[in-house]
């Protein structure tokens, strides 16, 4: 199968490409970040340009996996930066739908948040447009994807679990947003990728799936698991969420509204996905070994 993967230079997109490469002809789309993956054909494109979409239509792909997404874009203020990112995401989905191919969309558990953020609205809009397109599709909503570093590629944005694991292994103190009792259901990138490929192989069922890992854990428990594997005992420092929100305003790649909602639970029960694909998502306790070296 010839696959187009948008966001091929992202952590999740690159791992998906690498996982698919042994059995599929994979074309990884990237824009500003150089990409080199074994067995994968890189293709630099700007999906906002019609001529680049025309190039993709000539590739002869069998399906597209849409991973690319913008969280924050340049703008004079927080609201305009979030809206600029949302507009880019609309343009990306415009391009994907124009290909008129079976589509797997890597969405997010943020669609379930009770707090209404521009990013969550953008994800919900993408899902709605894909459902209404008439194309065969599958929507997967991963919770906290994680996995080992790539051997031949460095994504522009450092994967958050790599940052957390490094702190646990090297720092005497690990700062945590709020009380750390909010829950995540981390999914290993190999399991997520295998689920995408299994759905494509069987024929897309035109429905959405939660794509979490095999266990739900509080942030405090996640840190404890990493610390046990690393044989470390760092101090966990719980800090007010407002401090992180203020810091996010100064960082080019962080959306303050997302940090403000960070204490929402992000659970993603994989039972229906497992039943559909025959896979079993590994618990974080097992997969976390890939984060501690």
Model-derived segments and spans:
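Mid/C-terminal beta-alpha module of Rossmann-like enzyme folds, strongest
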Residues: 198-257, 270, 276-293
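N-terminal Rossmann NAD(P)H-binding glycine-rich loop of SDR-like oxidoreductase domains
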Residues: 3-22
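N-terminal Rossmann-fold cofactor-binding loop
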Residues: 29-34, 47
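Conserved catalytic-site region of short-chain dehydrogenase/reductase
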Residues: 73, 109-121, 145-157
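A conserved pocket-lining segment of Rossmann-fold NAD(P)-dependent short-chain dehydrogenase/reductase
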Residues: 163-187, 195, 199, 210
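Conserved beta-loop-beta element that borders a ligand/cofactor-binding pocket
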Residues: 128-154
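NAD(P)H-binding glycine-rich loop region in Rossmannoid oxidoreductase-like domains
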Residues: 41-99, 109-115
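Glycine-rich "substrate-gating" loop/helix at the edge of Rossmann-like oxidoreductase active sites
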Residues: 146-157, 178-189, 213-215
């Amino acid at each position: 199968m010839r696959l187009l993967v948008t966001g091929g230079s992202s952590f999740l997109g690159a791992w998906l490409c690498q996982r698919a490469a042994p059995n599929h002809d994979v074309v990884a789309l990237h824009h500003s970040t150089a990409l080199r993956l074994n067995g994968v054909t890189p293709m630099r494109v700007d999906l906002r340009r019609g001529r680049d979409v025309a190039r993709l239509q000539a590739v002869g792909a069998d399906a597209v996996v849409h991973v690319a997404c913008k969280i924050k874009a340049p703008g004079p203020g927080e609201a305009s930066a979030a809206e600029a990112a949302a507009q880019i995401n609309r343009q990306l989905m415009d391009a994907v739908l124009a290909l008129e191919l079976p589509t797997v969309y890597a969405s997010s558990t943020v669609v379930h948040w009770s707090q209404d953020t521009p990013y969550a609205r953008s994800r919900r809009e993408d899902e709605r447009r894909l459902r209404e397109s008439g194309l065969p599709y599958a929507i997967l909503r991963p919770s906290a994807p994680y996995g080992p570093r790539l051997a031949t590629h460095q994504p522009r944005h450092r994967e958050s679990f790599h940052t957390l694991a490094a702190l646990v292994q090297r720092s005497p103190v690990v700062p945590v947003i709020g009380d750390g009792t909010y829950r995540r259901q981390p999914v290993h990138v190999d399991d997520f990728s295998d689920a995408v490929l299994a759905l494509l192989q069987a024929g897309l069922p035109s429905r959405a799936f939660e794509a979490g890992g095999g266990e739900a854990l509080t942030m405090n428990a996640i840190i404890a698991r990493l610390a046990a594997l690393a044989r470390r005992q760092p101090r966990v420092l719980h800090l007010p969420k407002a401090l992180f929100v203020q810091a996010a305003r100064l960082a080019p790649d962080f959306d303050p509204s997302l940090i403000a909602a960070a204490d929402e639970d992000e659970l993603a029960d994989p039972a229906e996905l497992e039943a559909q694909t025959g896979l079993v998502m590994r618990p974080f306790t097992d997969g976390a070994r890939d984060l501690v070296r």
